[in-house]
Amino acid sequence: MKMKVCTFAVSGLMLTLTVCAAPFETKVVGTCAGDVRVACKDTRDWVFDVQRVDADGVDEIAVRLSAAKDAPPPRFEVLFEFPQIRMNHVWTDGSTDGNRLGPDWRSWQWSDIAHGQPLACLHDGDNRNRLTMACSEALRKVEWRIALREENCMVVGGFRFFCAPEAPVREYEVRIRLDGRDMFWSDAVQEAAAWIARAAKLMSCRVPEAAYNPLYSTWYQFHQNVSANEIEAECAIAAKMGMKTVILDDGWQTDNNNRGYAFCGDWNVSPRRFPDMAAHVRRVHELGMKYMVWYSVPFVGRNSKNRERFKGKYLFEYKQHGAWVLDPRFPEVRKFLVDTYVAAMKEWGLDGFKLDFIDSFRFNGKDPAVAEDYAGRDIRSLPDAVNRLMMDVYAALSAENPDVLIEFRQKYIGPAIRQFGNMMRATDCPGDMQLNRQRIANLRLTSGGAAVHADMLEWHPTDTPEGAALPILSSMFGVIQYSMMLRDLPESHREVIRHWLAFSQAHRDTLLKGHFRAYHPESQYPLLEAESEAERIIGVYAAGQVVPCGAFDRTVYVLNGVSGDSAVLDFADGTATAEVFDAAGKAAGTVKLCRGVQRVAVPRSGYLRIVPPADYCLCKRFGDGEVQP
């Protein structure tokens, strides 16, 4: 038993007393992940209550802690292990490296309000779920893993709680969900992500239709060197192509082009770059585009006039970025940020905001508030304060405009973020269409009804039209953002952009809102599929990948996202004629399809449209499962 040594004074004498730390351990027997152990090495004055709450074939475990008075909660863990049988890969919302099942000595990951979510799926190589685990803690830091113990080929997994500084509380509850059902792996992940939001009692904010509109971003091509005239010129071209929104990124608040965030925090527009910001926004509105502006939420730069104003109200100095990180537990900090965004919306006529770097609201070592007994802070818990800040921001902005657009990027994309964000963007991967596709797919599985956006697309203007179309096709299951000098593109590239923008919007209910399935994450998603009542759209991204076209009960589109000029189809129903289109959407003939697996010609970056004939009759099943046409 662990011993604690306590030293205290009595009548001027120093006494030392050795006492026993109070451990806690219990087991929940017979779950789909084997026996689950709940353990705490030192409960101090906390009481644990562990209950099994099974529902719909899924194991749920509720862990409740209570104390007689407010106190920092104790560190505890929920662990399990079972044999590795048909368990080859692990998916997480940040997986991009082949979903490796790592060794137990280096496989702990973590999540909190602004970093991922506590969710992982152990799957085989045939798209089947073996175990999906999740927990209901969406705000505080949680450590978690699924890994392999090399000594005996046992899969070990679980969660660790309160590994980071946490403010005193009197009670705490968390639920663990373990799903071992044999089902398509991405369906299991989507169910678990929805469960986290329900279990944590988090309500997603409104997602206006404009959140699904394609847009133009200034970041990759302009970086900080932005100006009203340049943006208006690009927006004039973008609007004619079909883009509906522009995001003005970093640089509008400073004349400095040296990157970094030393000039953030005052949030006054540069008069040299934008002499009349409100008039500039109006001119873009007249083009038919909405206007969003970037802010780095927590940063007050070393060159900011507000740096002294908030002295003593920072979490730490972020030297790498040349800025200080505000502490949102101070009410005046939250008010300053809310007022800043509301004033910008009112004065400039903004439609939305790109709110960046909220993952920097963290401790860089110890919590500075503890030594000050939380003086001046009306919220003790940092995750709770971040949540309160962003909820206040959304409430204030949506009061001005119920259809306000708010974008966040990976990794701040969990269910708590969806309370105040309606656009979730793949994190930066300039020029990397494969990584963009992976990140879009990961977001589609975990973002509920929020609009999932691609990272901004760019390519070299001397590429072929078919080459220009490839990154677009890799991003078709997210809202497409462009960030390139449109004025420098040849007409053949503009034609490709116009076609695929029109295609993505004509099919947005399927591509962006339909039931989404992602195949073979261990192979970087060679096949993605979205389905609505009217149609099924399949993107193929690996040469030779067999494309299951599914039942011939609706129109099927097959998008050729590889560099070759053919596709391998598995056609289940009879015969059909497929229409063929090239990268710019121009008709390129027809091809006959028959039952079974076949290779058909499809232009590079083109697609097929397979429409059921008018006299097609859906199959009906009788009695013992016999199928009749």
Predicted regions mapped to residue ranges:
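Positively charged n-region of N-terminal signal peptides that target proteins for export
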Residues: 1-6
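Bacterial N-terminal signal peptides
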Residues: 8-18
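N-terminal accessory beta-strand-rich subdomains and adjacent acidic, glycine-rich linkers
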Residues: 22-196, 202, 565-571, 578-585, ...
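Active-site-proximal substrate-binding groove within the catalytic cores of carbohydrate-active enzymes
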Residues: 166-173, 389-615
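An acidic-aromatic substrate-binding cleft motif
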Residues: 196-237, 241-245, 253-254
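Active-site mouth loops of central-metabolism enzymes
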Residues: 218-229, 322-336, 458-464
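Short, acidic/polar
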Residues: 225-240, 333-346, 468
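Aromatic- and carboxylate-enriched substrate-binding clefts and catalytic-loop regions
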Residues: 249-454
